């Protein structure tokens, strides 16, 4: 595959993943913090605080999971290299 096309595909996938994360986060936080039948157009103080905390926690967990998955992926790559070296040296 052409490196430019690969880079473009990776960028498109990243945008799609970020949009998916945003949609899931807003849906989950809205469901948790805003009652299904509301009478006011503006958020109440409690709803606003709840949404702020929910989004903050969601992003924090997303970042932690990303770091952990990257760490595990690197460990897997190192293990595969060691296994391949063991196979080629025998």
From Swiss-Prot:
GO MF term list: metal ion binding
Keywords: Chaperone, Disulfide bond, Membrane, Metal-binding, Mitochondrion, Mitochondrion inner membrane, Protein transport, Translocation, Transport, Zinc
Keyword Transport: yes
Highest taxon of source: Eukaryota
GO cellular component entries: mitochondrial inner membrane
Presence of the UniProt keyword Magnesium in the record: no
Disulphide linkage map: 29-54, 33-50
GO BP annotations, alphabetical order: protein insertion into mitochondrial inner membrane
Span(s) of short sequence motif Twin CX3C motif: 29-54
Family membership: Belongs to the small Tim family.
Assembly with partners or alone: Heterohexamer; composed of 3 copies of TIMM9 and 3 copies of TIMM10/TIM10A, named soluble 70 kDa complex. The complex forms a 6-bladed alpha-propeller structure and associates with the TIMM22 component of the TIM22 complex. Interacts with multi-pass transmembrane proteins in transit.
Summary of the function given for this chain in its UniProt record: Mitochondrial intermembrane chaperone that participates in the import and insertion of multi-pass transmembrane proteins into the mitochondrial inner membrane. May also be required for the transfer of beta-barrel precursors from the TOM complex to the sorting and assembly machinery (SAM complex) of the outer membrane. Acts as a chaperone-like protein that protects the hydrophobic precursors from aggregation and guide them through the mitochondrial intermembrane space.
Protein name listed in UniProt: Mitochondrial import inner membrane translocase subunit Tim10-B
UniProt gene name: timm10-b
């Amino acid at each position: 595959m052409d490196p430019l096309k690969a880079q473009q595909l990776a960028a498109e996938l990243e945008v799609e993943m970020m949009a998916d994360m945003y949609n899931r986060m807003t849906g989950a936080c809205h469901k948790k913090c805003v009652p299904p039948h509301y009478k006011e157009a503006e958020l109440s103080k409690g709803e606003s605080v709840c949404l702020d905390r929910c989004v903050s926690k969601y992003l924090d967990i997303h970042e932690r999971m990303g770091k952990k998955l990257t760490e595990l992926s690197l460990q897997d790559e190192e293990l595969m290299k060691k296994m391949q070296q063991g196979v080629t040296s025998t």
